[in-house]
């Protein structure tokens, strides 16, 4: 009887891990090869005037929820949870039709126009980056933005998987 109990105990412990679980990323979703020599030197996205992508800004449904993206640039500010996406999507098409580059300063947002630009500030450490919105997501009820791997790296939350941020749309100067 003791052997059976010990076997079940060992089997249960085998499923345990000492590594923290991540809310927004898996342990192996980061770079598959070497990082760029200094990711901190990758420049933020530079806001510029671009025509909006009609197909990427049409209303859509994801996971049973309807989204209606903004049809023009307008003020936007929201606080919430940011996550990041990496190697699993690297090289795959984004909602804009561009290929996802985990080393570019880009992000996915459910309703900000594609393309548009936003300043994202990590509320836990004050770091801030500017990203270009070129994809849709995240489709998780508590998350407001999905950043590229390098944007999350620069904000200091890759290991955590997610963090609390403020997202503010950057409007063109008139």
Where are each of the predicted segments found?
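Sec-dependent bacterial lipoprotein signal peptides
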Residues: 1-14
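Secreted/periplasmic proteins
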Residues: 16-174
């Amino acid at each position: 009887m003791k052997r059976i109990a010990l076997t079940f105990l060992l089997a249960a412990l085998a499923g345990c891990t000492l590594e923290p679980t991540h809310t927004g990323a898996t342990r192996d979703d980061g770079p598959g090869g070497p990082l760029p020599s200094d990711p901190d030197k990758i420049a933020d996205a530079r806001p510029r005037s671009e025509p909006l992508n009609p197909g990427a800004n049409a209303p859509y449904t994801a996971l049973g929820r309807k989204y209606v993206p903004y049809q023009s640039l307008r003020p936007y500010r929201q606080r919430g949870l940011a996550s990041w996406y990496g190697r699993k999507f690297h090289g795959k098409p984004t909602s804009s039709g561009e290929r996802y580059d985990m080393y570019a300063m880009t992000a996915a947002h459910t309703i900000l126009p594609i393309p548009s630009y936003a300043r994202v500030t990590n509320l836990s450490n004050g770091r801030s980056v500017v990203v270009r919105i070129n994809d849709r997501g995240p489709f998780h009820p508590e998350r407001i933005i999905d950043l590229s791997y390098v944007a999350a790296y620069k904000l200091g939350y890759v290991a955590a998987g997610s963090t609390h941020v403020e997202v503010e749309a950057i409007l063109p100067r008139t």
